[in-house]
């Protein structure tokens, strides 16, 4: 009887040892083998291409392949679409759902954001793919990368709200103040 008891206990211990073998925490890796960007993992922004729209709406073909219609809330007092609406342009939209419809809290025309921007102390180019190049050698802490995260523009380590994005003007605001840039050549 003791042999059966010890035999069953040894089988139980072996089962526990083998079942715990693979319980080490695994590092979070993307399919490409790179560590996931902690900033992009909590991004609530919807990215896509505008396929149609009107005065108060944008129909967006998202990067996931979905087609979504976003409306401008008639109660909004501020302009929620920054950079204009042109079919075929890339957009970053922060939205919310109300009464079964998708509404825009903010929409940034990424195509309008690309290009050369300059001010008295900065002269830079925002390029596709998240890179920024600076034209001034004397510039302190030049921006080298950009991304949109939760409706905010991140230039290297600086985070900005886009106050205005027009054909020739870009106004950015953060805790240090408002920065106005004009379209360069």
What is the predicted role of each segment?
Residues 1-5, 22:
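Positively charged n-region of N-terminal signal peptides that target proteins for export
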Residues 5-13:
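Sec-dependent signal peptide hydrophobic core
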Residues 16-19:
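C-terminal motif of bacterial Sec signal peptides marking the signal peptidase cleavage site
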Residues 21-47, 52-185:
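Lipid interaction determinants
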């Amino acid at each position: 009887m003791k042999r059966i008891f010890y035999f069953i206990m040894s089988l139980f211990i072996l089962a526990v040892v083998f079942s715990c073998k693979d319980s080490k925490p695994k590092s979070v890796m993307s399919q490409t083998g790179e560590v996931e960007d902690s900033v992009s993992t909590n991004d609530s922004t919807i990215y896509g291409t505008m396929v149609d729209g009107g005065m108060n709406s944008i129909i967006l073909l998202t990067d996931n392949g979905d087609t979504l219609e976003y409306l401008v809330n008639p109660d909004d007092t501020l302009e929620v679409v920054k950079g204009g609406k042109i079919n075929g342009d890339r957009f970053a939209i922060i939205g919310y759902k109300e009464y079964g419809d998708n509404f825009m809290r903010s929409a940034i025309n990424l195509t309008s954001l690309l290009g050369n921007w300059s001010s008295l102390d900065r002269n830079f180019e925002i390029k596709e793919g998240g890179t920024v190049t600076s034209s001034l050698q004397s510039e302190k802490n030049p921006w080298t990368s950009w991304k949109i995260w939760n409706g905010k523009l991140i230039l290297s380590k600086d985070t900005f709200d886009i106050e205005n994005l027009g054909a020739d003007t870009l106004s950015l605001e953060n805790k240090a103040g408002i920065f106005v840039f004009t379209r360069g050549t």
